[in-house]
């Protein structure tokens, strides 16, 4: 029997990453969800034309939606062009949907997309995080910790 792959061995191609989310929000948990796309959107993603930095996820009428994400138009699509900033449905189980909805009902919580990628089967997946906005002091603390860790690594390298 084959042993399961570790996270380092999993092969996936990152399409878009929301780097600002880790700085602006305190991520409590993350979840991998599927996304409903049109054919021209998938082809455009394979070319690398997307941005999820300004987008967010929301629960409407018992469904999870990705709002304000940008997927560039596909140049070869003539008649079936997609809308660049349309709402895209996210695929998630009912149990996870109710858990996410309950999480967003708490004060200051939101759903933020972290990474969009092709998984090992070639399907587009989105990792969303349940997040709470950071205050300015929290951001400074995070920066100070990161700087201190860099300094420690430099000192360890010099001593070796």
UniProtKB/Swiss-Prot annotation:
<dbReference type="GO" id="GO:0005829">
    <property type="term" value="C:cytosol"/>
</dbReference>
<dbReference type="InterPro" id="IPR000037">
    <property type="entry name" value="SsrA-bd_prot"/>
</dbReference>
<dbReference type="InterPro" id="IPR023620">
    <property type="entry name" value="SmpB"/>
</dbReference>
<keyword id="KW-0694">RNA-binding</keyword>
<comment type="function">
    <text>Required for rescue of stalled ribosomes mediated by trans-translation. Binds to transfer-messenger RNA (tmRNA), required for stable association of tmRNA with ribosomes. tmRNA and SmpB together mimic tRNA shape, replacing the anticodon stem-loop with SmpB. tmRNA is encoded by the ssrA gene; the 2 termini fold to resemble tRNA(Ala) and it encodes a 'tag peptide', a short internal open reading frame. During trans-translation Ala-aminoacylated tmRNA acts like a tRNA, entering the A-site of stalled ribosomes, displacing the stalled mRNA.</text>
</comment>
<dbReference type="Pfam" id="PF01668">
    <property type="entry name" value="SmpB"/>
</dbReference>
<comment type="similarity">
    <text>Belongs to the SmpB family.</text>
</comment>
<dbReference type="GO" id="GO:0070929">
    <property type="term" value="P:trans-translation"/>
</dbReference>
<protein>
    <recommendedName>
        <fullName>SsrA-binding protein</fullName>
    </recommendedName>
</protein>
<dbReference type="GO" id="GO:0003723">
    <property type="term" value="F:RNA binding"/>
</dbReference>
<keyword id="KW-0963">Cytoplasm</keyword>
């Amino acid at each position: 029997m084959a042993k399961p792959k570790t996270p380092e061995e999993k092969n996936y191609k990152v399409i878009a990453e929301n780097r600002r989310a880790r700085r602006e929000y305190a991520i409590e948990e993350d979840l991998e969800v599927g996304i409903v796309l049109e054919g021209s959107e998938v082809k455009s993603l394979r070319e690398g034309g997307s941005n999820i930095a300004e987008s967010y996820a929301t629960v409407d009428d018992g469904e999870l939606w990705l709002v304000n994400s940008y997927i560039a138009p596909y140049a070869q699509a003539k008649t079936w062009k997609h809308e660049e900033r349309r709402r895209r449905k996210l695929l998630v189980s009912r149990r996870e949907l109710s858990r996410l909805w309950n999480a967003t009902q708490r004060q200051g919580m939101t759903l933020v997309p972290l990474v969009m990628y092709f998984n090992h089967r070639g399907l587009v997946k989105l990792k969303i995080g349940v997040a709470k906005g950071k205050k300015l002091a929290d951001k400074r603390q995070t920066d100070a910790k990161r700087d201190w860790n860099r300094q420690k690594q430099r000192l360890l390298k010099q001593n070796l």
